[in-house]
């Protein structure tokens, strides 16, 4: 392949009709100037945090709602506004945002908070290696170095609690009793209301001093959000009239997920740009929907536990053998043989039945209970993804290299 060929490709895409004015406006990380349909939540949060401006410690807040209901962007919006107005009143405020999906251990959360003040304190905690008690002592020291209010936002707090327990919350919600100059307030954000069941009652009462609920958006509200972003994201006249309503309607089916709506609009624009189209049409939205679903399914399969991956491969082998739909017993038999083949201790049939239900809930397989008349009821299992897709994902998973070498004969012997 010569350089001229590549040059011509780059030139072609560079000089194609420009769809986007500012694509970043459609990213999840972008904080807009206005937040449609979240005035009630903004006012609630402002009311909870306003004591800061009077020199008083605000309550801890627990914020919850499903994915894409505007929790994170609203918290960022309100805390950024608080920081601006606090300067006017000469009240020092620090806001520390921690994504607990990534920073998911007690040690790393504490280190993250300490390192927020590294330029001021000269203290930097490594990602591993120090005793946790020492990190906590450093945290208290750097926060309490001067009079100020520190608001710690723990986003996806449920991920942290499920992985590492609630000791860190116990410490942070009581830290003010150990400080002399600074005051700390916690904002916990969760997609999962049930996660409160994991908390010690004392932690729960401290964290949930105030609660703010974010309900799902409906299709009309999603349309307003997209219209607002589209003005800044796209060049004038490039969106067909039906594009935004379709993105909103599709995302409304996904429990009113604004993130999904923004992704649909962005990916539809990217597809149109790649095609060299002068406009984004509804056809591009449907293509975007298909691409996002494929990407989501790939991510779901990649993050399955090992036994679920082996179980899925058993169903793949049955599919390649022309034996789907299969019942639970047939699937378990092949799964057990695979485990024996790769020296993995098999789970019980009852546990595998639970894993089948989980794969069904994730949409990777379809496990439908059907009546066989006088023979009773049985579960018929089918694949919802192609064997090629599963194998392609497994090809990059070092744990499953051995599994990929296995095929199955018509007599269900593994080869």
From Swiss-Prot:
Keywords (A to Z) from UniProt: ATP-binding, DNA replication, Nucleotide-binding
| Keyword set includes Ribosomal protein | no
Question: Is Nucleotide-binding a UniProt keyword of this protein?
Answer: yes
List the SMART domains hit by this protein, alphabetically.
AAA (SM00382), Cdc6_C (SM01074)
The superkingdom listed in its UniProt entry is Archaea
Residues engaged in binding ATP: 69-73, 217, 229
Q: Which GO terms describe its biological process?
A: DNA replication
Q: Name one GO molecular function term.
A: ATP hydrolysis activity
Query: Which InterPro entries does the record cross-reference, listed alphabetically?
Result: AAA+_ATPase, AAA_16, Cdc6_C, Cdc6_lid, ORC1/CDC6, Orc1/Cdc6_arc, P-loop_NTPase, WH-like_DNA-bd_sf
Transmembrane feature ranges: none
Tell me which Pfam families the record gives.
Answer: AAA_16 (PF13191), Cdc6_C (PF09079), Cdc6_lid (PF22703)
Functional description taken from the UniProt entry: Involved in regulation of DNA replication.
The entry assigns this protein to a family as follows:
Belongs to the CDC6/cdc18 family.
* Name of the featured protein: ORC1-type DNA replication protein
Q: Native species of this protein?
A: Thermococcus onnurineus (strain NA1)
Q: What is the lineage of its organism?
A: Archaea, Methanobacteriati, Methanobacteriota, Thermococci, Thermococcales
Q: Which gene encodes it?
A: cdc6
């Amino acid at each position: 392949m010569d350089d001229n060929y590549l040059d011509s490709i780059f030139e072609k895409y560079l000089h194609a009709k420009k769809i986007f004015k500012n694509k970043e406006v459609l990213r999840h990380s972008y904080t807009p100037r206005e937040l449609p349909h979240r005035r009630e939540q903004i006012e609630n949060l402002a009311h909870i945090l306003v004591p800061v401006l009077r020199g008083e410690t605000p309550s801890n807040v627990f914020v919850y709602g499903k994915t894409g209901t505007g929790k994170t962007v609203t918290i960022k919006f309100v805390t950024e506004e608080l920081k601006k107005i606090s300067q006017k009143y000469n009240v020092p405020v620090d806001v520390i945002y921690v994504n607990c999906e990534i920073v998911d251990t007690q040690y790393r959360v504490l280190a993250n908070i300490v390192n927020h003040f590294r330029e001021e304190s000269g203290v930097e905690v490594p990602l591993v290696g120090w005793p946790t008690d020492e990190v906590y002592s450093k945290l208290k020291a750097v926060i309490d170095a001067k009079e100020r209010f520190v608001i710690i936002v723990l986003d996806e707090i449920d991920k942290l609690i499920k992985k590492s327990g609630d000791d860190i919350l116990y410490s942070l919600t009581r830290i003010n009793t150990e400080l002399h100059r600074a005051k700390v307030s916690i904002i916990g954000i969760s997609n999962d209301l049930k996660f409160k069941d994991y908390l010690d009652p004392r932690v729960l009462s401290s964290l949930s001093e105030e609660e703010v609920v974010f309900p799902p958006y409906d299709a009309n509200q999603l349309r307003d959000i997209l219209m607002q972003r589209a003005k800044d994201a796209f060049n004038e006249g490039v969106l067909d009239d039906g594009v935004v309503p379709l993105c909103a309607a599709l995302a409304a089916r996904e429990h009113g997920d604004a993130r999904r709506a923004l992704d649909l609009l962005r990916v539809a624009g990217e597809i149109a740009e790649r095609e060299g189209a002068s406009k984004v049409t509804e056809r591009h939205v449907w293509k975007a929907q298909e691409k996002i679903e494929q990407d989501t399914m790939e991510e779901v399969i990649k993050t399955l536990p090992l036994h679920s991956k082996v179980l899925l491969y058993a169903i793949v082998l049955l599919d390649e053998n022309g034996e789907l739909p299969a019942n639970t017993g047939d699937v378990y038999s092949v799964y057990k043989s695979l485990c024996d083949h790769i020296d993995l201790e098999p789970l019980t049939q009852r546990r595998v039945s639970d894993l089948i239900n989980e794969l069904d809930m994730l949409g990777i397989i379809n496990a439908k209970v059907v009546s066989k008349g006088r023979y009773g009821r049985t579960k018929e299992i089918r694949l919802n993804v192609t064997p090629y897709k599963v194998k392609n994902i497994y090809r990059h998973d070092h744990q499953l290299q051995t599994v990929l070498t296995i095929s199955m004969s018509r007599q269900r012997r593994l080869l």
